[in-house]
């Protein structure tokens, strides 16, 4: 009993319920008890809005941890601060004592999990319009599956929240059991959501797209292909013409965005400023660029890996003393004197080109894009036709169409019969700095050891690393959660 009292404040935080305004993400939180709540359609909508809120926490989607997870791969590094997190990203840590980024993001995702589960438990009993109820349940299922996915990719097996069984919060399911829950939850969402949806909310494309990514993790290639091609054949989604435009406020709700978490100007997200260099801390609009936290920056390895003519390079990275950037109305050569590497991520700089508007620029977080789904489709086709991580040079002509849609948009020549090596390149360059896909890809492909361990040190900011698959395939589980459970929750292997 004492164990439960210690753990409940973290995993079973009361649902935040919010009043109605025009923007469902701008509502103010209020708490209600089940005795007076879960009675009307308005309350159901209010509860659903509360499910989204934790994803906008500082360390959650688009926040510090979401940006910093990129440093586990070979695309990025952390400039300073958060020594415990840096130790994990350099595969030196034997414990996860990082109480800010890692643990706080874990808590934020579990807040969403708890609130989504409450919606799924209570909304079915409300007398309301059937179509509205179906949509609410679909969004809750998507957000539940999405949050579990983000955590499972990091930590493996998870406690599965059950409002009827509080003790379940103290026991981790196996990885297979956890992925099965995610799969089932997203399948439910595919039966409840519609292709048409409001901005900032998931639709049917998001549900099928996330399901395709889950199947790829599980190596269920036929299922991954079917899920991805359900999105493709719908005709509801397409690539934005210019890659750079995707990361602008003007195009943040394009058909390419399957799920983009809505922004609150002046409040959320802080993604752009986390990537901006810090030329003058506390200065007023220093030129030519820099009033950021310089939390995460790009590696020389990434900068040099772009193929000649790849338009994604200019839209993603810039080199000190070489590349011209526009910031706060001025165009000049990048300086970034305080960056440890000469490379800066400029992917989210667009809101600041004309004017620096504060740390929260109002740019939606691109949580899932159509390009990702196209590349999952190509990957599934390759694995079904002799290509894959162990046959990386095998050509697979059947993957040409989805593969080349992405490659052509980047300004590169099409490849008639792409290989898995070609796919690896496209996924790296297409999805850089979008929540750690590079690292998660290399891990699920079983290639992290060979690629990471072969990389030389890049200054002191990105040292040579030793990735041990039996340990580093998963991050160490947050020590705070283990302690709060009095050891009922177990650490990942070999930590």
Name what the model sees in each region.
Residues 45-59, 82-154, 172, 176, ...:
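Conserved, well-structured interaction surfaces
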Residues 21-83, 187-190, 201-335, 452, ...:
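An aromatic- and glycine-enriched ligand-binding surface/loop that stacks and positions planar moieties
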Residues 82, 87-98, 304-370:
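Flexible, polar/acidic helix-loop-strand segments at domain edges
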Residues 19-21, 76-81, 109-112, 181, ...:
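Long, intrinsically disordered, low-complexity segments
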């Amino acid at each position: 009993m004492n164990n439960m009292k210690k753990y409940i404040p973290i995993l079973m935080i009361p649902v935040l319920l919010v009043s109605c305004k025009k923007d469902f993400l701008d509502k103010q939180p209020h708490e209600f008890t089940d005795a007076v709540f879960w009675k009307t359609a308005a309350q159901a909508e209010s509860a659903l809005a509360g499910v989204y809120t934790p994803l906008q926490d500082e360390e959650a989607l688009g926040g510090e941890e979401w940006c910093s997870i990129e440093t586990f791969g070979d695309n990025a590094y952390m400039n300073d601060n958060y020594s415990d997190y840096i130790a994990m990203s350099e595969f030196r840590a034997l414990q996860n004592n990082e109480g800010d980024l890692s643990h706080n993001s874990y808590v934020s995702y579990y807040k969403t999990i708890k609130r989504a589960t409450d919606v799924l438990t209570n909304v079915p009993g409300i007398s309301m319009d059937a179509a509205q109820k179906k949509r609410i349940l679909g969004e809750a299922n998507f957000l539940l599956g999405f949050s579990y996915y983000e955590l499972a990719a990091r930590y493996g097996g998870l406690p599965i929240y059950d409002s009827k069984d509080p003790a379940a919060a103290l026991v981790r399911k196996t990885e297979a059991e956890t992925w099965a829950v995610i799969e089932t939850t997203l399948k439910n969402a595919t039966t409840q959501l519609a292709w048409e949806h409001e901005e900032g909310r998931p639709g049917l494309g998001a549900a099928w797209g996330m399901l395709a990514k889950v199947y790829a993790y599980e190596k269920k290639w036929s299922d991954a292909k079917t899920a991805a091609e359900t999105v493709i054949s719908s005709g509801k989604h397409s690539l934005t013409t210019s890659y750079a435009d995707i990361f602008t406020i003007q195009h943040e709700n394009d058909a390419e965005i399957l799920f983009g978490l809505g922004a609150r100007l002046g409040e959320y997200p802080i993604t752009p400023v986390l990537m901006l260099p810090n030329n003058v801390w506390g200065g007023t609009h220093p030129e030519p660029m820099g009033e950021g936290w310089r939390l995460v920056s790009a590696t020389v390895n990434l900068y040099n890996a772009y193929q000649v003519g790849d338009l994604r390079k200019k839209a993603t990275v810039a080199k000190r003393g070489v590349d011209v950037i526009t910031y706060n109305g001025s165009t000049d050569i990048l300086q970034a004197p305080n960056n440890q590497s000469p490379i800066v991520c400029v992917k989210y700089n667009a809101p600041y080109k004309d004017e620096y508007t504060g740390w929260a620029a109002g740019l939606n977080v691109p949580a899932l894009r159509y390009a990702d789904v196209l590349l999952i489709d190509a990957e599934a086709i390759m694995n079904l036709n002799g290509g894959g991580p162990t046959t990386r040079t095998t050509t697979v002509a059947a993957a040409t169409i989805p593969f080349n849609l992405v490659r052509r948009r980047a300004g590169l020549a099409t490849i008639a019969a792409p290989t898995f090596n070609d796919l690896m390149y496209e996924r790296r360059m297409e999805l850089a700095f979008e929540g750690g896909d590079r690292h998660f890809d290399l891990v699920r492909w079983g290639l992290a050891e060979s690629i990471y361990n072969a990389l030389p040190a890049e200054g002191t900011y990105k040292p040579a690393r030793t990735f041990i698959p039996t340990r580093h395939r998963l991050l160490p589980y947050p020590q705070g959660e283990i302690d709060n459970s009095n050891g009922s929750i177990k650490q990942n292997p070999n930590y």
